[in-house]
């Protein structure tokens, strides 16, 4: 491309300049004007960085929680995103908040959990957020360096690896010429308190009241004070002449405010001599006569004012971590200091440690570890229990695969369902809330793995209402209040809440009866989740292991199509190979089976009593097969019947409107009051409708109801609508009848009825079920013979394949294979779909 026509300016992208430095007096002017900007601790900086990138809310198991955007990795296009760990992240934020507010002793935050649960990614994203946030022009943090000059243009800059705050140049005590002792640090802090103490958000962290500089910085200051050329100068004048204040930018790569280590021995501070050129050494000796200079190195120093991440913290040499190795950590978490050159320096570091369950258990059992255990806060980071979030990870992993292969649209879903079910524990509680009925308690205890799976991943039909019904003391309310989010404003809440596109309602899963759906509420879901926390998710199939199985699925494909059936075969192969090949099959997991599982049928898979139990990896393959088969039955049925979803929705709304009119007319005494509530103007004819269309009602009841003659089914559906509306489960647009409302969640409450109408048998002229079945087999196995079939049969095959692609995202070849698979496994029978 001709450079003259190229709009891309490659020079400008590397055009950043070094930030200017300030004199000490210039810094103090800024400090006195806005001390809050300077008096930030590491915890404050991390919290501000997290909040700076934004937040949204999700509902998990009936519980609202905040999802901070930094954990979606906005820095690298989501490559290192952490999905579904909102409860864990809240614990982390709570601990940092307590440190920031100095509401308790300093604690190291230990993220503990099984391998590949996202622990390291969480800390890495916190570090990256801190790094990016510190580069924002409005968020200036300052450090200082000594600048020595010879008057001929040569300068030498001496920096401390601690990036100390310039406020620490004010000594805590100072002897005046008359022998009296003053407290310069306290005096400057008292002055800013006098100026800004009226601001409720202003506070002075105790760190800045008591912290001291490192020995080398103090030695330099003292040597400069004693130098003959500085005789008669005050400490302020010396600082003004020799010190420059500069803006701080955190950097993981350069070890500035952020340190990452994988060996506790790297916590030790190293003291090394400075190697300088001859001219620089002459300059140094000119100002610091007789002073042999050293430099300090170490992870603790480089993480000052920021974040220290210790990977695999308690592995140590041999079987356990040595107390000698983590002694520097004990000092840091105990006194906020580190030892260097036979003295101590104050540090302000937020410490994160990541470790697995085995290493943490070994530390717990060490007799000498109690001092460390008292100074850490454990945060469990387990495998995901939300299948929708598990899908997010798997989708990210196969992004490139989709460019080279045709991928079954159900592959990621079924893989996520299986992996999550292997991690679940059965409900076993012995006592229940006093307002629970016996039926509710019995349902709770008999929940099988597949139902628990869908409860954990269910879509909240009205998240705004879920949040509105939270008690005043709920932690979510407090968390939002700290962020300035007004939960009383419905528009604010609507914008805050996000809905996962892969989440399904319990009704859509086809696993729950109407009676069960009526019992399961937000309270039920919350109790189910919290009973097994934090054990649930520690065991089972890890995301790395499911990724390996997915890779084997791709490797065993035909080089073009990656299907669910291949994935299920790979799962069965893994179980056949056993724990000698796949170590996770032999992990020492606690007993997880339930003795309350009744015989059940999922799709076309029949499970006897106790089959498909918690922790039964082989049985759970049959469970996930049943879910997959039921999914195929619904998808192929809808694609075959080929009805317009919008038309079906309108028919359902019309049915409910007329059923309500019929119910209103039954109440003779109050009909004159109730009927007008359900009267409406027909948008197609413009006529007022105040009487039910009984012929229309009966036509739909022939599809919806087993007994369409007694009228009882119609009454139940009308009452169901009224109950859901009064309980806030469905919300019809204000001042609109149900038939005219559109911006609502009606289908969430009537998904079963909607699906029945959508998949009702269709009459196809000139095509028999047998001909259609044979045509699919011929198209796959004998294309020449297929072309000899009648045009109307081939057209119907095309319609089904096209609908599978348009409605459910099937690639053309996989759509054909899927229908043939469903016919072979007797998942579908065209005789029950078309007439």
Q: What are these model-derived regions, one by one?
A:
Residues 1-43:
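Long, basic/Gly/Ser/Thr-rich N-terminal segments
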Residues 28-835:
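Conserved ASCE/P-loop NTPase catalytic core
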